[in-house]
Amino acid sequence: MRRPKKYESGEATQYISRRAALRKLQLSLNDFRRLCILKGVYPREPKHRRRAQKGSSEIKVLYHTKDIRFLLHESIVWTLRDYKIFAKKSNRDRAIKDFRNLKRRLALFPEIKLDHIVKERYPTFIDALKDLDDCLTLLFLFSTFPSLHLIPREQSNLCRRLTIEFLHYVIASKSLRKVFISIKGYYFQAEIKGQKVTWIVPHYYPFKPQSRQEVDFKVMSIFVEFYTIMLGFTNFRLFHGLNLAYPPQFPSSVLQDSEESLKDEASFVSDRIAALNFELLRTDKVQEDEEELDIDMELLEQDGDSKRIIKMKQEAQEVSRLRTLFKGLKFFINREVPREPLVILIRSFGGKVSWDSSIFAGSTYDEADETITHQIVDRPSISTQYISRDYIQPQWVFDCVNQRQLLPTNKYFIGETLPPHLSPFVDSKRDSYIPPEEKALLDPSLIETHAQSDDDSEDEAEKEEEEAVDQELLDAQLQLAYQQETAEYKKYGGPDGVNEDEEDPEDDDEDDDEEEEEEELDEKTKRLQEEKQKMSVQSGKVHKVNKRQLHKAEVDEHRLQARMVKPRHRNLFRKLIREKQTKEKEEWLLRKKRRTHEANEKEARKTAKREARKEAAAAAAKASKLGK
C-alpha cells in the first residue's frame, strides 16, 4: 500500500487558489468575477491557512474546490468564452473594413440567460423574498443614476421600471409596516408572505460625478444584471397573487381621450404608472384582501387563549387598523416636499393624495379643493392658508405610521420645533438602553405618564418651596408662644396659679391605691399576651440585603467561570466579556447624559417660572401704586 504524501488529503485538497481556478476554467479574471457573482460563489477563509495553501505562508484568495467543480458544468462559461471569439472576429472585421459582416455579427451578439440561475439559487419563492433586501436597495440606487460610462441608460431605466412595479404591489397589498428617515435615505419595511423585507430609497439629490474611481461600478452593474432578472420574476409572481395584470395596466376609465393620451399613449401610461396615484387593472373584480384577514382572525379565535395566540390576535388587530390609517383623509403635497415617499405612505394606508400638476403628471385635484384635510408643507411660512385643513410638516406622516395611530397635529405645524424622529427598527431585547421617547413608540400611554411625571415633579418642587416658607413662619410663631408660656409658668407657678411644690397629704393615699391597681392590670395583660404569642404566628424580621457581599459573590463566581473555560475558548470568552463591558459602559454613559440633560431642563424651567413670577409681582405692585 502506497503511503500518502503530504498535502494530498485533508484541508489542502478542500481549497483551491484563484489562479488555479482561472487555469481550470480557462477564463479571464473579469469573466471569473462575473461568473462568481452570478452563481453566488465567494472566497472562503480556511481554519489553517498554511495547510490549505500546501505549506505556503503567502496570503492567497481561496475557493472551495467543490464550488469550482460546480462552475465547470455551467453553460454561462461557454457564453463567456464566446465573448472572446466575438471580440476577435469583430475587431478583424473593423480592421479590414468589412462593415457588412460586422453588422451581421453584432446582430448575433451572444447573450447570457440568467433564468436558470435564479431558479437554481432560489428553489422556492420564499427563498427569493428572504434575499430581496439587497436587491431592492441596489436597484433603487441605480434607478437614480444618469447614463454613465459603465452604467448604460437602458439598465437604469429598467431598474426604475421594476422598482415602480414593486411599489405598486406594496400599495395594492397594503403590506407596508415601518418607515424611517435617515441621512442615507428613506427606510421602508414591508411584510410579504410572512417575510419582512427592508430596503432603502436614496434621497433625491442631483448626481455628482466622482473625480476618482472609488466605487467599482463595473462589479455593481453585474449584481444589478442578476437582480433585475430576479425582481422581474418576483414582481410577476406578486402581481398574479393579487390578481393584478402584469405588466401594470390601467382601467379604461383612466385612459380617457385627451390631447396627451392621443399624442403618445405609451408615455402617458408610463408617467401615470410612475405617479403611483392610480389603481391598477385587476383580472377579477372582487378584492379578497379583507376576506382573507377575516378568515385568519376566525382561525385564531378557534385556538386556545395562550399568550402566543393573544399576542397574534393583538398584532392582527393592529395591522387591520394600520391598513386603513389614512382612510377618509385627503392630502396635498407642496412643491418643496419629496413626492414619491409620501405618496407611497399615504396610498399604502388608504389615503388620497395629490400635488401641483406642473411638478409631475398624475395629480387628481388642485390646491384650491375645499375637501383637502391636510397640506404637507416644508417651509417656515406660507402666504395663503385655508381654515378647513391642517398645515403639517412631512414628519407627521412618518410618525403616524410608526406609532400606528393619527397623532395630534399641533406639534407638527409650520414653524414648530419637531419632536425627535425615532427609529422603529430597534430590538428592545437586544438594546439595553431605551430612551423614554422610544419606549413611547411601543406603548403610547408612556407619553402621558412621562409628561405627568415632569409636571408632578415641578408642582412638588413648588409646593415644597411654599411649605418651607410656611414652616418657617409657623416655627417662629410657636417659639414666641413657648417663650410667653414659660414666662407665665415661672411667674405664677402653673397654669391654674397653683405652685407645684405645695401638695395635699390626702392625694398621696389615692395615688398609692391607683398604682397598685395599675400593677395588677399590667400583670394580667402580660399573661394574656404570653398565651397569645404561644398560639399565634409571630411576625418575621426584615432581612437586610448586603449589596457589597452580593457583589463580591458575583465577582467570585465570575472568576470561577473564567478559570473553568477551556484554553481554546479563552479568547472567545474574553471577547464576549469585553463586549458586555463596553455595552454596559455605553448604557451607563447614555443614562448619565440623560440625567444631566433632564436636570438642566428642569432647572431652566424653574428659573423661567421664578422670573415670570417676579415680573408678575413687580407688574402687580406697579399697578397698585398707580391705582393709589
UniProtKB/Swiss-Prot annotation:
Residues 590-626 form a coiled coil. Residues 617-628 have a biased composition (Low complexity). Gene3D superfamilies: BRCT domain. Residues 454-470, 498-522 have a biased composition (Acidic residues). It is found in: Nucleus, Nucleolus; Nucleus, Nucleoplasm. SMART domains: BRCT. One of its GO terms (biological process) is maturation of 5.8S rRNA from tricistronic rRNA transcript (SSU-rRNA, 5.8S rRNA, LSU-rRNA). Signal peptide: none annotated. Keywords: Coiled coil, Nucleus, Phosphoprotein, Ribosome biogenesis, rRNA processing. GO terms for molecular function: ribonucleoprotein complex binding; RNA binding. Belongs to the pescadillo family. Required for maturation of ribosomal RNAs and formation of the large ribosomal subunit. PANTHER family: PESCADILLO - RELATED (PTHR12221), PESCADILLO HOMOLOG (PTHR12221:SF6). This is Pescadillo homolog.
